[in-house]
Amino acid sequence: MISVRRGLSQLWYWGKRGVIGIIALWMAGILIFAFLPVPFSMVMIERQLGAWLTGDFAYVAHSDWVPMDEISPYMALAVMAAEDQKFPDHWGFDVGAIESALSHNQRNQKRIRGASTLSQQTAKNVFLWDGRSWIRKGLEVGLTAGIELIWTKRRILTVYLNIAEFGNGIFGVEAAARHFFNKPASKLSASEAALLAAVLPNPLRFKVNAPSGYVISRQQWILRQMHQLGGKTFLQENTLD
């Protein structure tokens, strides 16, 4: 009996230290990545491990980091128009979108709608695993609050664009621009940026180089939203250009 208690005590001790260590690493990551390029994300690690487990040792998950000044303003505008139009104003969470998603999901449980902001998506992609669970969502909330507190909006957008997945093994807008359009991210047109943003909900299902009718329709919707937001002026007014 004593040995069992001692074992449980040791398990609790090391488990607690492990949790504290992970939290410390996350905090350090938030501070470091406020200034330095993010070399890899949890999504990249997942994809890399998945490739190795299937015997694909040629697969290399990486992104070609570029600063915001080397990314077309249309790309920043497109992802905000598509994913998070209130990005410049909220503190990491869009309460209205959350309430709308909850209401929709109660009525239609077969087609679940998300309400994650760009800040939440960035926190998840950099620090957390993929999937749906209350534990992961709770951690996402804490990490989102952390990056909103430490990072600028421009920094969050820069990190997001550099680690977002645009296709199988294609991470970051620079790699996507060169792979799909044979040009650097700085030269992307409004139409090209909207097409890249259109596949972001599921880049392994939706294809930039073979867009379905849905993707084309979404691209056109994003272009209209970009115009309604005010185009490049929207970025300038919110110091995101």
Swiss-Prot record:
Catalytic activity as recorded in UniProt: [GlcNAc-(1->4)-Mur2Ac(oyl-L-Ala-gamma-D-Glu-L-Lys-D-Ala-D-Ala)](n)-di-trans,octa-cis-undecaprenyl diphosphate + beta-D-GlcNAc-(1->4)-Mur2Ac(oyl-L-Ala-gamma-D-Glu-L-Lys-D-Ala-D-Ala)-di-trans,octa-cis-undecaprenyl diphosphate = [GlcNAc-(1->4)-Mur2Ac(oyl-L-Ala-gamma-D-Glu-L-Lys-D-Ala-D-Ala)](n+1)-di-trans,octa-cis-undecaprenyl diphosphate + di-trans,octa-cis-undecaprenyl diphosphate + H(+)
Q: Does the keyword Ribosomal protein apply?
A: no
Q: Which GO terms describe its biological process?
A: cell wall organization; peptidoglycan biosynthetic process; regulation of cell shape
Which Gene3D superfamilies does the annotation name? Biosynthetic peptidoglycan transglycosylase-like
Name one matching Pfam family.
Transgly
Key word Transmembrane helix present: yes
Return the protein name: Biosynthetic peptidoglycan transglycosylase
Where does it mainly reside? membrane
User: Where is the chain membrane-spanning?
Assistant: 18-38
* Protein encoded by which gene: mtgA
Origin species, per record, is Yersinia pseudotuberculosis serotype O:3 (strain YPIII)
Its EC top class is transferase
Q: Where in the cell is it found?
A: Cell inner membrane
Q: Name one GO cellular component term.
A: peptidoglycan-based cell wall
Quick one: which pathway? Cell wall biogenesis; peptidoglycan biosynthesis
